[in-house]
Every structure is written in C-alpha cells, then in structure tokens.
Amino acid sequence: MSVLDTIARPYAKAIFELAIENQSIEKWKKTLIFINEIIRSKKIEKFLSGSLSPSYLSSFFIFVAGDHIDKDARNLIKLLAENQRFKIFNNILRQFLKLETSYQGNTIIELISAYSLQEHEIIDIRCILQKIFLSKIKFIYKIDHQILDGIIIKKADTVFDFSVRSYLKQLSDVLNF
C-alpha cells in the first residue's frame, strides 16, 4: 500500500459515509469520476501544480466544474485545495471505488434481542452497522429471553454484547474479585 493511498483513505471513507447517509453512492461515483477527469486534463494539471492560493485554486476549479457538481462536491474541492490534495485525487477515487465494491456485498449479522424489536429500531441498528462495516447489512434476527434485556450483535468471530445479562456477569466478576 502506498503512502498516497494511506493519505487518500480518510477522504474516500468520509465521502463514502456521506454517500451512504444520503443514499447517493452512484451520484458521488459519477461526481468523483468527473472531478478526476478535470484534474487529469493537461491544462488543468499544470494549473493545479502551480503556486496559487487555496481559495483562488478552489474558486477556479469550481468555476471550471460549473453546475456539474453540487454543494457537497464544492466543499470537497475547497478542502482538497486547502490541504493541497489534488495530486492524490486519483487515489481518493480508487479508494472510494474499493469501498463501493465491498459495500455491494452483504455482511451477515446475527442480531439477538431479549424482546421483539420495532421496525424503526432495526432500521437504526442497520444504519449504524452499515457505517461501521461499510457494507450492506443482512440480519439473522433471533429473540432470546435469557439475555434479560438489550441486544447482542455477532459478525463472524466478533461479538458486541450489549445485554443486561452480560453487564450483570461483568459486575459479578468485579465483585467476586
């Protein structure tokens, strides 16, 4: 993995999380490809490598892009100009496309609750887990009254235990220590 990929990853991840949140992955993909094409054009490439101020550079770039980019993309361009990151934009695009590819697959999560969850609670849990795992979530939903209250989330070998039973066990272990 190159240093440029390491620098690009947080940008790509932030963009991808925004795209998931706004349900606009395809729109962002097209926008990033469009921005990349502008950056890669010979005339613009020379212009971007000059010693212009970040505000002038971002204003110029936004002018060139015109109505093809929205407010969020304009903010991204301002951020890239401010941090002098236009040179790694191709890496940002590649990282975004990797995240999109992994997102297309479903992550299977076992969700165990003490009682039946309401639909909006399941949707909220799914949204949070999609942000954490950066993939679509498919639930295997079970009810287990023995956990008393709360939920347990299992993904392969990883377990997030937010059950009352688990808290009571931890408390018991501390008191018996």
Curated annotation (Swiss-Prot):
Gene Ontology CC terms, in alphabetical order: plasma membrane; proton-transporting ATP synthase complex
Transmembrane segments: none
Molecular function, one GO term: proton-transporting ATP synthase activity, rotational mechanism
InterPro entries cross-referenced by the UniProt entry: ATP_synth_OSCP/delta_N_sf, ATPase_OSCP/dsu
Membrane topology: Peripheral membrane protein
Keywords: ATP synthesis, Cell membrane, CF(1), Hydrogen ion transport, Ion transport, Membrane, Transport
Cellular compartment(s): Cell membrane
Subunit note: F-type ATPases have 2 components, F(1) - the catalytic core - and F(0) - the membrane proton channel. F(1) has five subunits: alpha(3), beta(3), gamma(1), delta(1), epsilon(1). F(0) has three main subunits: a(1), b(2) and c(10-14). The alpha and beta chains form an alternating ring which encloses part of the gamma chain. F(1) is attached to F(0) by a central stalk formed by the gamma and epsilon chains, while a peripheral stalk is formed by the delta and b chains.
Described purpose of this protein according to its UniProt entry: F(1)F(0) ATP synthase produces ATP from ADP in the presence of a proton or sodium gradient. F-type ATPases consist of two structural domains, F(1) containing the extramembraneous catalytic core and F(0) containing the membrane proton channel, linked together by a central stalk and a peripheral stalk. During catalysis, ATP synthesis in the catalytic domain of F(1) is coupled via a rotary mechanism of the central stalk subunits to proton translocation.
NCBIfam families: ATP_synt_delta (TIGR01145), PRK05758.2-2 (NF004402)
PANTHER family on file: ATP SYNTHASE DELTA CHAIN
Similarity field: Belongs to the ATPase delta chain family.
Protein name as annotated: ATP synthase subunit delta
